[in-house]
Structure formats: C-alpha cells, structure tokens
C-alpha cells in the first residue's frame, strides 16, 4: 500500500510540474509582449505627401521663391552640435549662446554634416522649376561663414543661383524666421521644427514638414503633422 501511495504522489508531482511548465511556456513574456493586427494598423492622422506629389502640385505654376531650414531639414548636422556641447558646455545647452561655438559651426564643422536625401530630391526639383531657393536658419550670425559654400557643393546648386544663407538667429519669445520669409516673398517653406511650420502658417504660406532623424541631438523630437501640415514620407534621412 505504501508503494502505491508513493507512486501516486510521484505521478501527481510530475503532473503538477508539467502543468506549471506548460503554463509558463504559454504565458506572455514581459520581454516579448507581442502585438496584434489592430496595433500594427494603428496610424496617426497625418497628411503624408511624397516629393513626387509635391512636384505634381506645382505643375503649371510659375517659378517662385522657396525656403529651407538647414539643421535637421537639409543637413544632419548633429555631429557638429555634439562636438560643440562636449567642448563648451557638457552639462547644459549654454554652448548654443557661445559665439565661439557658432564660429566653429559656421566655418568648417558642417564638413561633418550629412546631406539628407530628401533635401537632394527637393532642391533638384526646385532647381528644375527655376525657383529661387533661400536657406533660412536659426543659427547665430558670425563674421564669416562657409555654410553657403557647403550647401552649394552638397546640393549641386550653381553659383549663379546660390543665395547666401540667411542667419535669422534665435531670439527668445520671437519667431525670427517670419520677417525673412516675408522679405523674400517665400511661398513654400520646408522645415523640421514647430517654429518652421508656425512661421509659414503665420504668413499664410505653404509649410511642409521634413522629419527630424530620431538620433538627432535636438530633443525632444517634434510632433510632425500637429498643425495639420503636409509631412514628407521617408524624410528622416
């Protein structure tokens, strides 16, 4: 009888262990929560457009003035800003107020900036159309600058149509780009930041969002499409 009891106990223990192992195997892991079709299909209500669609929308329209922001719009320039922060203010953003940083950034550090592919396509489009292209940046003005030459070289802009970069600067409480967009009669403005889109909206012109790369040093990332503006697909690079 004792042997029968031990056998039954062993069988029960084995069943319990098997059931527990089976239950553990079938339970979702916190590291692998999985997903479902509804989650995969979920999309933000954003007005996505392609470069081809932008080009089509301009068919039949005469040449016009168009504007581009620079950092995170036409250039992935985080390497220079990363270097500047480490050199001048590792624990804060004070380097952005340091004229010495801007002298470096505007006079050589863009050699480490990567031209964005979406910018190549857009600039080529507007050159084909005969549009006047202006670069309007929030960077601080410096006594000399090589940014204009870098952009002309990177995007194959002929010297005859290359306009010098406009350094609007960053003025607290102001959107410093508005006056320049107005002064140059810009009809389309491309930018990655909320300020870029807000400047265009202030003047009633077409503001088109270019996505800021997720590894940009400029954080937090903006909410593309938050103003109902057009957002270019695959424009993070």
Curated annotation (Swiss-Prot):
<feature type="binding site">
    <location>
        <position position="177"/>
    </location>
    <ligand>
        <name>substrate</name>
    </ligand>
</feature>
<feature type="active site" description="Nucleophile">
    <location>
        <position position="69"/>
    </location>
</feature>
<keyword id="KW-0574">Periplasm</keyword>
<dbReference type="InterPro" id="IPR005519">
    <property type="entry name" value="Acid_phosphat_B-like"/>
</dbReference>
<keyword id="KW-0479">Metal-binding</keyword>
<comment type="similarity">
    <text>Belongs to the class B bacterial acid phosphatase family.</text>
</comment>
<keyword id="KW-0460">Magnesium</keyword>
<feature type="binding site">
    <location>
        <position position="192"/>
    </location>
    <ligand>
        <name>Mg(2+)</name>
    </ligand>
</feature>
<feature type="active site" description="Proton donor">
    <location>
        <position position="71"/>
    </location>
</feature>
<feature type="binding site">
    <location>
        <position position="69"/>
    </location>
    <ligand>
        <name>Mg(2+)</name>
    </ligand>
</feature>
<dbReference type="GO" id="GO:0030288">
    <property type="term" value="C:outer membrane-bounded periplasmic space"/>
</dbReference>
<dbReference type="InterPro" id="IPR036412">
    <property type="entry name" value="HAD-like_sf"/>
</dbReference>
<feature type="binding site">
    <location>
        <position position="71"/>
    </location>
    <ligand>
        <name>Mg(2+)</name>
    </ligand>
</feature>
<keyword id="KW-0378">Hydrolase</keyword>
<dbReference type="Pfam" id="PF03767">
    <property type="entry name" value="Acid_phosphat_B"/>
</dbReference>
<feature type="binding site">
    <location>
        <begin position="137"/>
        <end position="138"/>
    </location>
    <ligand>
        <name>substrate</name>
    </ligand>
</feature>
<comment type="function">
    <text>Dephosphorylates several organic phosphate monoesters. Also has a phosphotransferase activity catalyzing the transfer of low-energy phosphate groups from organic phosphate monoesters to free hydroxyl groups of various organic compounds.</text>
</comment>
<dbReference type="GO" id="GO:0003993">
    <property type="term" value="F:acid phosphatase activity"/>
</dbReference>
<keyword id="KW-0732">Signal</keyword>
<dbReference type="InterPro" id="IPR010025">
    <property type="entry name" value="HAD-SF_ppase_IIIB_AphA"/>
</dbReference>
<protein>
    <recommendedName>
        <fullName>Class B acid phosphatase</fullName>
        <ecNumber>3.1.3.2</ecNumber>
    </recommendedName>
</protein>
<dbReference type="GO" id="GO:0046872">
    <property type="term" value="F:metal ion binding"/>
</dbReference>
<feature type="signal peptide">
    <location>
        <begin position="1"/>
        <end position="25"/>
    </location>
</feature>
<dbReference type="InterPro" id="IPR023214">
    <property type="entry name" value="HAD_sf"/>
</dbReference>
<comment type="subunit">
    <text>Homotetramer.</text>
</comment>
